[in-house]
Every structure is written in C-alpha cells, then in structure tokens.
Amino acid sequence: MSKRVLILTGDAVEALEVFYPYYRCLEEDIQCTIASPVKKKLQTVVHDFLPEMETFTEKTGYKIDSHASVDEVDPADYDGLIIPGGRAPEYIRMNTKVQEIAAHFLKENKPLGVICHGQLVLTTVRKYLQDREVTAYPACRPEVEAAGAVFVEQTLHVDRNLVTGQAWPDLPKFMKEFFNVLKKAEKVNS
C-alpha cells in the first residue's frame, strides 16, 4: 500500500518549503495532500538572504493548490506530516483543527517534518513538545523554548519521529531524514 503524507500550510508559505517536499514525495510514489484552513489556490512567498540585510527578504512566489481544507482531514489517514515555514505558521497555528492534526502526529509518534517557522505550529501543542529537541529558524527560538522544547543549534535535527530544519537551504538533508523516519515507521508498523 502506498504511503500518504500530509503537508499542512496556508497563504504566505515559503515557496521552496512547500514545493520541494511536495514534489519529492511524488517522486518517491508517496501520495501527498496539501491542506490549508480553506481549500484554495495558496499564494506562496519567496524568502532570500542578502548580505546587506539583517533579516530575510520576502517577495511574492508562485501559487499552489491546496487539495483539502483542514476540516476535511483525518490525520489517522496519513503516515507522515510536513509543516513548512514562511509566514503561514503564524496564523494557521490558531486553527484548532491544525492544532489537533499536529498533536495527533506527536502523540502517535508518527513521522513529522517541520522546517523554518513551521515550529510555531508545534508551540500550540505544548504538552507533546515538552523536552523534545528541535531546531527552527533562529528567530523562533524564544517561542520554541517557551513551549518547553530544547532548541538545538543545528541546521537539521532528528529527535525520534520528529525531523526539524532551520530554513529552505536545509531541504535536501531535511527530506532525506524525513524519508528515513518514514521508512523506519513503515518497518515498525509492518
């Protein structure tokens, strides 16, 4: 049976952090569903790092369809979850169904990949984040630590079922580790 991965996001998602995982999943013959608070064509954004800037820049990116609203999603139907960054996590984390989906993957120890600002979603399900080691975009560190997680100063970190990355330049290693965790989970559940 084919594996199924859910990507949980919304408008202002970092373009690379949604497109790269989506197409990598398809390349691996994994069914991949993009879900957002409202099923629609999502507007992505492009973040870049310029030497003269103290923070990243943001420009309008491509659009991508979400396949389902979060209200249509049963997390039990999915083998893995990816939460991309960008600004989408700032507002989708307030959606109770988004919180339920994130909690399901942490509680059930199912493969979960979270990159950049995506960790902001996890801060809403603190009881499952306690003492978990994560990395994130460095500006998210105070919120991640306030939620009880241990911030690790690495560009990529794996804590059991949880794969975390700092930013889009880490996507190749991030997806490699996410697929490793997905394969291990498949062996355990076989």
Language-model regions, residue ranges each:
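Short, basic/aromatic beta-hairpin or loop at an interaction surface
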Residues: A136
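Extended, subdomain-level signal for the structured scaffold at the beginning of enzyme domains
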Residues: M1-E108, L120-E133, R141-S190
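Short, thiol/selenol-centered motifs that function as redox-active sites or metal-ligating centers
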Residues: I115-G118
